[in-house]
Design a protein with these regions (language model features):
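Tandem repeat domain/solenoid detector
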Residues: 173-174, 193-199, 208-210, 224, ...
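Ankyrin-repeat interhelical turn/loop motif and analogous interhelical turns
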Residues: 161, 196, 231, 266, ...
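Inter-helix linker motif
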Residues: 140-141, 160, 176, 195, ...
Length: 513
């Protein structure tokens, strides 16, 4: 046994020369029974959209005046778009200054000005926003109005530029303009997001003195800010203040509360709000439904997870891949492997097939050690022209390894590189098999010829596969050896498979010891 392992390692470390790999076959044997790899499924071509030409009937000519106006509008729109494109191009140049550009142009339309503001936000040039606003509004005094100040204060608040927002707020009042509900909301929410709740509450008090009544949106922003800073007790106080000020929480507020309590892992509070909503016959938003489902999956409460999963399924609420993986982990943890098949089929029927859902269906039959079940899924994938990938391949390899079926493991490994490139999980499967007595010399030589070990390490297998089967000895040894390195050593070079394997050998003395 030991001599076989050392022979495999010697084969891996032979670097005399690299032969040109033989030409690959386009397809494997179509035999699936026995868990051989299916054919190299082609990617389905996308349909080209049909092109339709709209031909105007000559029997119904348009009025001459209407045609002329339409043409003029098109020309003006074209030139407006060209001027805006030119302005943004000048603004994107290194060292450009919007103040200089505005002076050069003389003035900008409101469309051009707000496009510049959006550009500056996207480019993180926040300090220039208020400067160019001051210059632009002074070119035409009618621009000093509540709407423009409301928009600029909202931008500043959203970007956390509260000192600039305060200046604009004071300047607005100095012009005799009355701050609107939107302006106060921007100030309160901006301070709240930064965690400065003292100032946020000052503006909440000031708006009431100015006879601007807070609305639920005002308090909703505060609630969201409290949750961001994990100040959940203050959320309760905020709700009481809402009710005392004649602004009872509405459906949006309750949905927000449930999402924030869910995110914070406050299960009892989340459920309490949910029961309140049920008693008030309020609608549960799809994002709230997903948040509740995520919470139950995170806590592993399977009965409630399934209850809200069925509700999401019935309402056609899409679920993200991460949530689907969490649900799969709950089923795996409870040894309910057949539910993975049901989960994959249900979601495929509702939203369409994905690689993750095919993966779950394969895993279901893999855990049940059902060759017939896996064959059935592989045949279905072949009929649907599902492109083959390393996740599917590794599930089959891991199943062979779990069964200690070295015959089919060898066949599958020999066919593997005809369709997909191995990743670190595949390499780990081979070394774990060698540790169990498998003769991996042929596979190591084949991978050496294709120069796999000189390539950067990649992890392309879906994480749910690792969760299902575990990391195995090889990956655990890799992590252990890697953790012994200094942080700068880990990032100073691109890690190849050779680098990583040699590190493991150096750390362990020899693999498998």
């Amino acid at each position: 046994m030991k001599s076989s392992k050392m022979e495999c390692v010697r084969t891996l470390n032979q670097h005399n020369h690299v032969k040109t790999p033989p030409a690959r076959r386009s397809f494997f044997s179509s035999t699936i029974n026995g868990l051989l790899f299916p054919p190299n499924f082609p990617i389905r071509p996308k349909r080209l959209p049909s092109l339709r030409l709209s031909v105007r009937s000559s029997s119904s000519p348009q009025p001459q005046g209407s045609s002329t106006e339409h043409t003029t509008l098109l020309v003006e729109t074209f030139h407006e778009h060209r001027r805006l494109k030119s302005l943004l191009k000048r603004l994107s140049k290194t060292g450009s200054c919007p103040l200089i550009l505005l002076r050069e142009d003389g003035d900008w339309s409101k469309e051009h000005f707000w496009a510049v503001v959006r550009f500056l936000r996207h480019a993180s040039r926040f300090e220039e926003i208020l400067q160019v606003f001051d210059l632009w509004k002074n070119i035409e005094k009618s621009r000093i109005n509540e709407l423009n100040y409301s928009k600029i204060i909202k931008v500043l608040g959203e970007e956390g530029l509260m000192e600039e927002a305060i200046l604009s707020f004071k300047e607005m009042k100095s012009y005799g303009l009355n701050p609107t509900l939107e302006v106060y909301n921007s100030m309160i929410h901006g301070f709240g997001q930064k965690g400065n709740f003292a100032d946020a509450l000052v503006y909440l008090h000031e708006m009431r003195e100015d006879n601007v009544a807070p609305e639920t949106d005002t308090y909703d922003g505060l609630i969201e800010a409290y949750a961001k800073h994990k100040m959940y007790d203050e959320i309760g106080m905020c709700l009481k203040k809402m009710k005392l000020n004649g602004c009872p929480p509405d459906q949006i507020t309750y949905n927000l509360l449930m999402r924030q309590f869910s995110k914070g892992g406050l299960l009892k509070r989340m459920e309490s709000v949910y029961h309140t909503m049920i008693s008030k016959r309020m609608h549960l938003q799809s994002s709230t439904l997903v948040a509740m489902l995520e919470t139950y999956a995170r806590f592993g409460i399977m009965d409630k997870m399934e209850k809200f999963y069925l509700r999401a399924l019935n309402t056609k609420t899409p679920l993200g891949d991460d949530l689907i993986r969490k649900m799969a982990e709950v089923y795996i943890g409870n040894y309910m492997f057949s539910r993975l098949e049901t989960l994959g089929v249900d979601l495929s029927t509702a939203f369409g097939e994905t690689d993750l859902l095919w993966c779950l269906r394969l895993l279901s039959h893999s855990f049940l050690l059902s060759r017939q079940g896996m064959d059935s899924i592989l045949q279905e994938m072949e009929r649907e022209n599902v492109p083959w990938n390393v996740t599917f391949a590794n599930i089959i390899l891991l199943t062979h390894l779990k069964m200690k079926d070295f015959t089919h493991l060898r066949i599958s490994l020999s066919q593997l590189t005809h369709s997909v490139e191995p990743d670190i999980v595949t390499v780990g499967i081979l070394f774990n098999a060698i540790d169990m007595g498998f003769d991996g010399t042929g596979t190591l030589e084949a991978w050496q010829r294709m120069e796999l070990f000189y390539k950067a390490v990649e992890m392309n297998t879906d994480p749910v596969v690792i969760t299902s089967f575990g990391k195995g000895n090889f990956l655990q040894n890799c992590e252990l050896a890697f953790s012994t390195l200094e942080p700068e050593e880990r990032v100073k070079k691109i890690w190849t498979y050779n680098n990583l394997i040699n590190l493991v050998l150096k750390h362990k003395g020899s693999y498998g010891q």
